């Protein structure tokens, strides 16, 4: 999934006035968490988030297509926090965390290290 598509999907869920660079910065927090779990280098955002008119590079996000919902659910929850809508934030945050946990569990299952047969008890 591309970053700008995740932002558009979140905007469809929660119309807001937050600038695209700031939304990209919010998504990078989740992307760094995912990169750390994967053991990959975390991508960097090449835009000045203070400049609300700056264009954001449309980079590919780390999670594959089956787990794209993590990004727009997480961003929607953060938009609820930004809008100070605590009731929606609590629900959306729980849903987003569940989606991220499922995606991370899937990744760990699919990318498990080869067992050497040595067990320590």
Regions found by a protein language model. Name each.
Residues 55-67:
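Short, mixed-charge amphipathic alpha-helical segments
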Residues 15-21, 66-68, 72-121:
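Short loop/turn elements at secondary-structure junctions
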Residues 1-58, 102-121:
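Conserved short "hinge" loops at termini or chain/domain junctions
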